[in-house]
Amino acid sequence: MKIKEKMTDFGFSYVKKSKKNSMIEDIFNNVSYKYDLMNDIMSFGVHRIWKNILVYCNSTNPDQKILDLASGTGDITKRLSKLINKKGFIVSLDINRKMLKICRKKIRNSGTIRNIFYIQANSEYLPFKKNIFDSVIVSFGFRNFTEKKKQLSSIFNVLKPGGKLLILEFSKPLFEFLKKIYDIYSFYCIPKMGNIISGNYYSYKYLVESIKIHPSQKKLNKILSESEFCNSEYINISGGIVAIHRCYKF
């Protein structure tokens, strides 16, 4: 008897779990070239402030070992690279080769070449020994994970005892008027902007849908609290449009 394969969300649609990673990869292959430009335009540059706050919340020590997970084009890696010394290092890991290539070029153009390593891998199966990293940071990548519980378990394994996980992710606006404006802008403007700038209407349509179905800050905090992590907390930024979650391995 043929076993029916489990389905998972892909924006507002459902696809086979085995297909989602390749579909996500196709999306980022399509948008990688204009990815940074679109981030600036879509957020009016505010994403830079969000990422600065995220790095500040990490309280980076110069000799930390940090995993920038789902690193994309390297905005977080670039910020962190200025804060570590010769004893510390950063691993920039992403499943998408094109995004990692842009990341590497961006870091090198910034003048930083030491103590940064680039790895293409699936975050469900992190290719590291246990208890390596002082912190793991996921910036706008968590909602794209297919098996979130597996990813959290994998992250937990590679963190040192006392290490922390930080997640910056889109969330739910706290105020009704902001929610209405945000929804109108997201659904009616962002896909059209994506089409004009990068020629990828449907990639940015998926982006908006993935944000909409992502758990609220309270629900994600509960997911983290019910996992192996401890002391889960979050802060809202920009009226809850995004939130930073922080939890620890003890």
Curated annotation (Swiss-Prot):
One GO term of the biological process aspect: methylation
InterPro entries reported in the protein's UniProt record: SAM-dependent_MTases_sf, UbiE/COQ5_MeTrFase, UbiE/COQ5_MeTrFase_CS
Record flagged with keyword Transmembrane helix: no
Record EC number: 2.1.1.163, 2.1.1.201
Signal peptide, first to last residue: none
Main EC class the enzyme belongs to: transferase
Annotated binding of S-adenosyl-L-methionine, by residue: T73, D94, N122, S123, S139
Biological or metabolic pathway of the protein: Quinol/quinone metabolism; menaquinone biosynthesis; menaquinol from 1,4-dihydroxy-2-naphthoate: step 2/2; Cofactor biosynthesis; ubiquinone biosynthesis
The UniProt record lists the keyword Methyltransferase: yes
Protein role: Methyltransferase required for the conversion of demethylmenaquinol (DMKH2) to menaquinol (MKH2) and the conversion of 2-polyprenyl-6-methoxy-1,4-benzoquinol (DDMQH2) to 2-polyprenyl-3-methyl-6-methoxy-1,4-benzoquinol (DMQH2).
UniProt family annotation: Belongs to the class I-like SAM-binding methyltransferase superfamily. MenG/UbiE family.
Name assigned to this protein: Ubiquinone/menaquinone biosynthesis C-methyltransferase UbiE
Organism expressing this protein natively: Wigglesworthia glossinidia brevipalpis
Upper taxonomic lineage: Bacteria, Pseudomonadati, Pseudomonadota, Gammaproteobacteria, Enterobacterales
